[in-house]
A protein has these predicted regions:
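C-terminal and inter-domain tail/linker signature
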Residues: 1-163
Protein backbone atom coordinates (compact mmCIF):
# COMPACT_ATOMS: atom_id res chain seq x y z
CA UNK A 1 0.00 0.00 0.00
CA UNK A 2 1.36 3.39 -0.95
CA UNK A 3 2.07 5.91 1.76
CA UNK A 4 -0.44 8.76 2.08
CA UNK A 5 2.60 11.05 2.54
CA UNK A 6 4.10 11.59 -0.91
CA UNK A 7 7.69 12.64 -0.35
CA UNK A 8 9.33 12.15 -3.76
CA UNK A 9 10.28 15.82 -4.10
CA UNK A 10 12.09 15.95 -0.72
CA UNK A 11 13.85 12.55 -0.62
CA UNK A 12 17.25 14.12 -1.31
CA UNK A 13 17.16 16.42 1.73
CA UNK A 14 20.56 16.27 3.48
CA UNK A 15 19.15 15.95 7.01
CA UNK A 16 17.89 12.36 7.05
CA UNK A 17 16.76 12.64 10.69
CA UNK A 18 14.56 15.59 9.70
CA UNK A 19 13.24 13.69 6.70
CA UNK A 20 12.36 10.69 8.89
CA UNK A 21 10.60 12.85 11.51
CA UNK A 22 8.63 14.82 8.92
CA UNK A 23 7.64 11.60 7.13
CA UNK A 24 6.52 9.95 10.37
CA UNK A 25 4.49 12.98 11.47
CA UNK A 26 2.73 13.68 8.18
CA UNK A 27 2.04 9.98 7.57
CA UNK A 28 0.35 9.93 10.98
CA UNK A 29 -1.71 12.99 10.00
CA UNK A 30 -2.72 11.47 6.65
CA UNK A 31 -3.62 8.20 8.38
CA UNK A 32 -5.77 10.16 10.87
CA UNK A 33 -3.62 8.73 13.69
CA UNK A 34 -4.08 11.39 16.36
CA UNK A 35 -2.44 9.13 18.97
CA UNK A 36 0.77 8.82 16.92
CA UNK A 37 0.87 12.57 16.30
CA UNK A 38 0.30 13.21 20.01
CA UNK A 39 3.25 10.95 20.89
CA UNK A 40 5.55 13.07 18.70
CA UNK A 41 4.77 16.41 20.35
CA UNK A 42 6.20 17.79 23.59
CA UNK A 43 4.07 18.27 26.70
CA UNK A 44 4.32 22.06 26.28
CA UNK A 45 3.49 21.88 22.55
CA UNK A 46 1.62 24.80 21.00
CA UNK A 47 -0.14 24.83 17.63
CA UNK A 48 -1.21 27.79 15.51
CA UNK A 49 -3.37 26.90 12.51
CA UNK A 50 -4.09 30.13 10.68
CA UNK A 51 -6.54 28.68 8.09
CA UNK A 52 -8.67 27.36 10.97
CA UNK A 53 -8.37 30.59 12.95
CA UNK A 54 -6.49 28.84 15.77
CA UNK A 55 -3.88 31.17 17.26
CA UNK A 56 -2.67 29.01 20.14
CA UNK A 57 -3.84 25.49 20.85
CA UNK A 58 -2.38 23.34 23.62
CA UNK A 59 -1.28 19.74 23.15
CA UNK A 60 -4.51 18.40 24.67
CA UNK A 61 -6.78 20.70 22.67
CA UNK A 62 -4.93 19.95 19.43
CA UNK A 63 -5.22 16.20 20.07
CA UNK A 64 -9.00 16.56 20.36
CA UNK A 65 -9.11 18.73 17.22
CA UNK A 66 -7.10 16.11 15.28
CA UNK A 67 -9.50 13.39 16.40
CA UNK A 68 -12.33 15.59 15.11
CA UNK A 69 -10.66 15.94 11.71
CA UNK A 70 -10.54 12.16 11.34
CA UNK A 71 -14.31 11.94 11.81
CA UNK A 72 -14.81 14.52 9.05
CA UNK A 73 -12.28 13.46 6.38
CA UNK A 74 -11.14 10.34 4.54
CA UNK A 75 -8.72 9.62 1.68
CA UNK A 76 -6.28 12.11 3.20
CA UNK A 77 -2.97 12.58 1.43
CA UNK A 78 -0.11 14.99 1.96
CA UNK A 79 2.22 15.71 -0.95
CA UNK A 80 5.48 17.45 -0.11
CA UNK A 81 6.66 20.22 -2.40
CA UNK A 82 9.79 21.33 -0.54
CA UNK A 83 11.50 20.86 2.82
CA UNK A 84 13.94 23.26 4.45
CA UNK A 85 15.50 23.45 7.89
CA UNK A 86 17.09 21.14 10.41
CA UNK A 87 16.36 18.48 13.01
CA UNK A 88 18.81 20.08 15.46
CA UNK A 89 17.36 20.88 18.90
CA UNK A 90 15.96 24.41 18.99
CA UNK A 91 15.81 24.63 15.21
CA UNK A 92 12.86 24.46 12.88
CA UNK A 93 11.79 22.99 9.58
CA UNK A 94 9.44 24.30 6.91
CA UNK A 95 7.46 21.88 4.76
CA UNK A 96 5.59 23.24 1.76
CA UNK A 97 2.85 20.72 1.00
CA UNK A 98 -0.56 19.98 -0.44
CA UNK A 99 -3.20 18.26 1.69
CA UNK A 100 -6.06 16.57 -0.16
CA UNK A 101 -9.10 14.90 1.37
CA UNK A 102 -12.64 13.66 0.81
CA UNK A 103 -15.44 14.51 3.22
CA UNK A 104 -16.80 11.45 5.07
CA UNK A 105 -19.88 13.36 6.18
CA UNK A 106 -21.63 16.59 5.40
CA UNK A 107 -19.60 19.26 7.18
CA UNK A 108 -20.90 20.65 10.45
CA UNK A 109 -21.72 24.37 10.45
CA UNK A 110 -18.58 25.17 12.46
CA UNK A 111 -16.35 23.65 9.72
CA UNK A 112 -18.05 25.26 6.71
CA UNK A 113 -16.13 28.58 6.78
CA UNK A 114 -12.88 26.62 6.28
CA UNK A 115 -14.15 24.58 3.33
CA UNK A 116 -15.17 25.38 -0.25
CA UNK A 117 -18.73 26.73 -0.50
CA UNK A 118 -21.29 23.97 -0.97
CA UNK A 119 -18.92 21.07 -0.29
CA UNK A 120 -20.75 17.97 0.93
CA UNK A 121 -20.22 14.32 1.86
CA UNK A 122 -18.19 12.55 -0.84
CA UNK A 123 -16.73 15.75 -2.30
CA UNK A 124 -12.96 16.21 -2.41
CA UNK A 125 -10.88 19.30 -1.83
CA UNK A 126 -7.50 20.34 -0.55
CA UNK A 127 -5.20 23.07 0.64
CA UNK A 128 -1.73 24.23 -0.18
CA UNK A 129 0.08 24.54 3.13
CA UNK A 130 3.23 25.89 4.72
CA UNK A 131 3.96 23.88 7.87
CA UNK A 132 6.65 25.17 10.24
CA UNK A 133 7.78 22.84 13.02
CA UNK A 134 10.16 23.66 15.89
CA UNK A 135 12.09 20.87 17.68
CA UNK A 136 12.93 20.69 21.36
CA UNK A 137 16.07 19.11 22.87
CA UNK A 138 14.35 15.69 23.01
CA UNK A 139 13.54 15.69 19.28
CA UNK A 140 9.86 16.30 19.93
CA UNK A 141 7.75 18.95 18.26
CA UNK A 142 7.59 21.99 20.54
CA UNK A 143 5.61 24.31 18.28
CA UNK A 144 3.81 24.09 14.96
CA UNK A 145 2.55 26.86 12.73
CA UNK A 146 0.31 26.19 9.72
CA UNK A 147 -0.57 28.61 6.96
CA UNK A 148 -2.69 27.54 4.02
CA UNK A 149 -5.15 28.34 1.28
CA UNK A 150 -7.85 26.22 -0.30
CA UNK A 151 -6.85 24.85 -3.70
CA UNK A 152 -8.15 26.94 -6.56
CA UNK A 153 -9.66 25.85 -9.86
CA UNK A 154 -6.89 24.68 -12.17
CA UNK A 155 -4.42 24.15 -9.29
CA UNK A 156 -1.38 22.23 -10.55
CA UNK A 157 1.18 21.05 -8.03
CA UNK A 158 3.72 20.64 -10.84
CA UNK A 159 3.76 24.42 -11.28
CA UNK A 160 5.90 24.40 -8.10
CA UNK A 161 8.60 22.18 -9.64
CA UNK A 162 12.02 23.63 -10.27
CA UNK A 163 12.20 26.44 -7.76
Amino acid sequence: MASPFISDRIQNHDDKVLLARITEYFEAFANADADKMDSMVADDYRMSDIPLGIVRSSKGAWYQQNKGFSSLMTNISVEAISLHGSSEPGSFAVLENVVRFTLKVDPPEVAKPNLPPGIKKGDSSGMIMLSTIWWNSDGKIARELEYGKLLWEGFDINAFNGW
